[in-house]
Structure formats: C-alpha cells, structure tokens
UniProtKB/Swiss-Prot annotation:
Residues 39-110 form the KH type-2 domain. This is Small ribosomal subunit protein uS3. Part of the 30S ribosomal subunit. Forms a tight complex with proteins S10 and S14. Residues 247-268 are annotated as: Disordered. Pfam families: KH_2, Ribosomal_S3_C. SMART domains: KH (SM00322). PROSITE patterns: KH_TYPE_2 (PS50823), RIBOSOMAL_S3 (PS00548). Keywords: Ribonucleoprotein, Ribosomal protein, RNA-binding, rRNA-binding. GO terms for molecular function: mRNA binding; rRNA binding; structural constituent of ribosome. GO terms for biological process: translation. InterPro entries: KH_dom (IPR004087), KH_dom-like_a/b (IPR015946), KH_dom_type_2 (IPR004044), KH_sf_prok-type (IPR009019), Ribosomal_S3_C_sf (IPR036419), Ribosomal_uS3_bac-typ (IPR005704), Ribosomal_uS3_C (IPR001351), Ribosomal_uS3_CS (IPR018280).
Length: 292
C-alpha cells in the first residue's frame, strides 16, 4: 500500500501537517475547497516563468473573509519582484477571483537540495532543455545524498529520449521505507513539456525517522537517539537486545586493545575479570617488583 498511496496524505498528523488549514461548516466545504484550488492555479499561472522555483503553496483561513497564502520557494526575490510588484499583482488578481481579502507571505527554503518538489522541478526543467535524463538523475541523486539525505528515489516516465514507446526509468540510493509511517518522507512531482509529449518526474526523499509522540512545537523533527528496531526483533525484548549489543561491542573493543598490546590468553582473561586495561609492560613491571 505504501508504494501506491501518496506519501504525504498517508502521514498527515503523524509527521506531516495540512497544506490547507481551515475549518468551516460542511455547507461551505465545497466552496472553500474550490477557492483553494483556484488560488493555487492562478498563482502558478502568474508565476509560470519561475514555476520551477515554487516548492509549495500553503493556505490558512482564520476568518471566512480573509485568506493568508504562504508561498514556499528557495528564491524569494524572484517571487516578490521589484519592490514587491509581483506580490501586489497576485493579491489583486486573487481578490478579483474570490472576492476576499488576501494576505501573501513568502517562506524561504533554506536547503533546496533536501526538498523533493524542488528536486523534481529541477529535473523537469533540465529535461525540457534537452539535457540527458540519465545524467540529470544521477547528478540530482549524488547532490542530495551529499547534503544529508538518508535515501532518495527518482522515477521518470514518458517518451524518454524521443522513443516511440513510452517507458520509465528509476534510480535509487539509500533507504526509502514507504511502508514505515514514522519515516519522514518528502514527495515531489513535476512535469516536463517536451516536443515528444509530457514526461513525468516523481521524487521520494527520506530524511530520517520520527520517534515518540509529536507535539505542535516539534512536528516533523527527526530524532535519531537510539538505533532502530530491526525486522524480527520484538518490541518487548528491544531494550534487552540493545544492552547485549553494547556489551558485545565493549568486549570486541577490549579484545582489539589486548591483541594490539600482545597479551596472552591468560593475561587477557585476568584483565577481563578485573575490568582493567593495563598493558603488558605494566604487568611485567609489577611481577619484577614482587620478585625483587
């Protein structure tokens, strides 16, 4: 099921938040939903020249007659325009469409290499410019992994390279656990308009796992304090298994130190019982002192 459903909708209120935040009477639901659709459509039409720089559009309504629109982008200057001209025009356009007061805010993406939508947009833009899709996918994959992604999967489909029969091509690196609900997976989709038709680009980006109960203040925060439970390990015995692993690692490190110092088996056994890390030279010096 995780392979088919949208990763964002599957994790809403687990480690993702709603993109449209409002609550009204059910009689107004269809009207408000259609307004949200029009807002996103008109903004993308107006900013079609820089549509590949838009990561997301969030809509917040605390008042039936006031709408707050948050445009998420890695390049705020191109969206704002000269002295805020673009924001002013967008506000006037949306006010005519839905006849409500519009407030527009800009939210900057600090790390675009770890934003799935920006990655998908970048790939689509380069494919439109006739860059080799294999080269583009491998370049995007390596860049995101170097910037700290724990896993990335990119799938591109359509008439690749002008082929007569449409096909898909996929690259993957690291872990992308789509079935794990606590996994913080970012998803992006974009389309490239080519002379051969539309080529679709999908990106799944794994940022880590969210453990424990989340609050509004730390929603989406990645916590990696403990190693994760492996398949086949029960939750009941997980702490016991962790303790056993720590003891085993301690024994291995102690054995490596003893081997480096050149201690015999008897000396190693004695040191393990005492829980000490004396070197062979110190033991020899003690024996000489006792003999003298």
């Amino acid at each position: 099921m995780g392979q088919k459903v949208h990763p964002y909708s599957l994790r809403v209120k687990i480690n993702k938040d709603w993109k449209s935040k409002w609550y009204f009477d059910k009689k107004l639901y269809s009207t408000i939903l259609h307004e949200d659709f029009l807002i996103r459509l008109e903004i993308m039409k107006f900013l079609k020249g820089i549509k590949f720089d838009i990561s997301d559009i969030e809509i917040i309504r605390n008042n039936p007659q006031k709408v707050t629109v948050v445009i998420v982008t890695p390049r705020p200057g191109s969206v704002i325009g000269l002295k805020g001209s673009n924001l002013e025009k967008i506000g006037q356009l949306l006010t005519k469409k839905i006849s409500k007061k519009i407030s527009i805010k800009i939210k900057e993406v600090k790390r675009p290499e770890l934003d799935a939508q920006i990655i998908a947009n970048g790939i689509a833009k380069q494919v439109e410019n006739r860059v080799s899709y294999r080269k583009v996918l491998k370049s995007s994959l390596s860049t995101s992994m170097l910037k700290g992604a724990q896993g990335l999967k990119i799938k591109i489909a359509g008439r690749l390279g002008g082929a007569e029969i449409a096909r898909s091509f996929e690259v993957k690196e690291g872990r992308v656990p789509l079935h794990t609900l606590r996994a913080n997976i970012d998803y992006g989709f974009s389309e490239a308009q080519t002379t051969y038709g539309i080529i679709g680009v999908k990106v799944w980006l794994f940022k880590g796992e969210v453990l424990g109960r989340q609050t509004n203040s730390d929603a989406g925060q990645v916590i990696n304090k403990k190693p994760f439970r492996e398949r086949g390990e029960s939750v009941k015995n997980f702490d016991k298994i962790l303790n056993n692993r720590e003891k085993a690692n301690e024994r291995q490190s102690r054995a490596a130190l003893n081997k480096k110092d050149g201690l015999s088996k008897d000396e190693t056994g004695l040191l393990n019982k005492l829980g000490s890390s004396f070197s062979k030279e110190r033991i020899d010096s003690n024996e000489q002192n006792i003999g003298g």
